[in-house]
Each structure stands twice: as C-alpha cells, then as structure tokens.
Amino acid sequence: MAGRYVALGSSMAAGPGIMPRAQGSPRLAGRSARNYPHQIAERQGYQLVDVTYSGATTAHILTDSHNNEPPQIDALDGTEELVTVTVGGNDVGYVPFLVA
C-alpha cells in the first residue's frame, strides 16, 4: 500500500452532489465518496485523509476554522507522500458568474 495522502480544498475537490456522501464526513462539507481524492487514493492505494470542504477559501486551508472545523492544514503531520490543494474559486467569488 502506498503512503498517506491528504486532500485539502473547497467544493471543487469535495464534490458536493456526487453520491454517495463520504462516510463520516460532516454533511455541510459536501464531501463525496467519489470525489477525485477518493478516486486517486483508491487507484494508487493511498491511505486518504480527505478534509476538503465546500465553501472553503484559502484562509480556511491555512489559518481559519470553517463550520467549527480546524484549518485544513492541521491535517498534515509530515508523513504524507501526496498532498493536493484545490482552492481559489471561493476567494475570487466565482459563484455569481455561474448564475449570471
């Protein structure tokens, strides 16, 4: 088995609306069991730590809590073989452009 993989990010990585929901994840996270971090972990044999969260911004990755969850970077412990960061859309306010 490959090593530890930590996925950080917003809804672009969490995969809200893609069923099934990731077991044990907070409902508000919108985390799918079929999001790309889960697919990478499954195909490559990684032990996945998925802390992606819908609505997250760069601040939620680095310093701020989000819906009572700690900053996502706290999931890193130095043993990771792979870390992905998928964030930025919420920082630039992309949602209004989707509904315009």
Model features per residue range: what roles?
Residues G3-R27, V92:
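Catalytic nucleophile-elbow at a beta strand-turn-alpha helix junction centered on a G-D-S/GDSL motif
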Residues A22-A100:
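Conserved SGNH/GDSL esterase-like catalytic core that processes O-acyl groups on lipids
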